[in-house]
Amino acid sequence: MSHKYLIEYYEVVTKQQRTKQLDFFVYVDTVVFTINPDRLLEPEDRLEVLVMKRPGGAKGKWALPGGLVDDNEKLELTSIRKVKEETGLTLKPRDLHQVGAFGDPNRDDRFRAIAIAYMALVPHPSELRPIKYSDAASFVTYRSLRDNRLLEFDHSNIIYAARKVARGLLEDTNVALSFCKPKFTMTELRKVYESFLQYRVDPANFRRKVAATTDFIVPLEEFSDFGSAPGRPAQMYRAGKSDRLSAQIRFRRSLDKVRPTGTSRKT
C-alpha cells in the first residue's frame, strides 16, 4: 500500500469509523512494587505488589490498577489517574517505567483489549484509600501472586515482566537506595536486592561488588547492631552522588543453593 494511498484513505475515514474498524480497547495497567519495612521477614516475602478488587470482578481475585485511556490523555497520565482512583496512591510521571504491550486475543473474555503496562517503585505507604472503581486495594506479596489463580486476566504475566524491568533498574541505577533509610547497613541494602531477585546473594560477593561501584554508597564513621554478626557492629552508609551506576551490579543465582520453600522455577 503506497504512502499516497494511505493519506487519501485517512482523509476519507472519520475518527469514529477508524475506532470502530479497529474494534478493540486500549487500557493502561500499572504494577507498583514496594518493600515491606518489616526487617524480620524473609527477603523473598518483603517484595509486594499493589493490587485491587474490581466491582463485579471475579470472586476472590485481585487485579492490577488500570483502565481505559481517555480521549486526548497521555498513557502516563492514565496510569497515574487509575492508580489514584483505585488505590488512593499518588504517582508522578518520573516514577513510571514502561514495561511493554500485552495483546493476546484471549487475555480478556469480554472483548479485544490491548494493555500498555507501566511499573513504579515506591516506599511502603502507611495506608491505601481507594477513591472509586475499586472494592479494595492492598499490597500483596509477590510470591503469593505467582499463583496466577489469584489474579484476573493476564496480570500475572504483566507482574512478572515488570519485575524484570525493576531488576534492570537495580543493576544500572541507585534505585535500591530509595528503599533504605538515609543511613543504612550493607545488609539492609543487600536485602533490597534479594527481595527483587527472589533469591539470596552471597554477602561477601555483594559487599565486594557494591564497594567497587564508584559513588554508589559512602561509608560513615557510624555503626549499627542490626545486620551484623553477633558482637560485631555493622558499618553504616549513605547514598553516593551518582544516580546511574558506574558498572552494572548483577548477582547470579547459585545453583548449589536450596530453592526457598514454596517457590517455582519461574521467579
Feature locations, PLM:
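Long, contiguous binding/interaction regions
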Residues: 83
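Active-site segment of metal-dependent pyrophosphate-handling enzymes
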Residues: 24, 43-48, 76-80, 88-143, ...
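Short histidine-centered catalytic/ligand-binding loop motif
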Residues: 64-72, 178-179
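Short proline/glycine-enriched turn/loop segments at secondary-structure junctions
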Residues: 18-20, 106, 223-229
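N-terminal strand-loop-strand
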Residues: 11, 15-63, 76
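Long, intrinsically disordered, low-complexity Ser/Thr/Pro-rich regulatory/activation regions
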Residues: 219-267
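NUDIX/MutT-family hydrolases
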Residues: 119-120, 128-170, 179-187, 205-215, ...
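Short helix-coil junctions and helix-kink-helix linkers
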Residues: 191-200
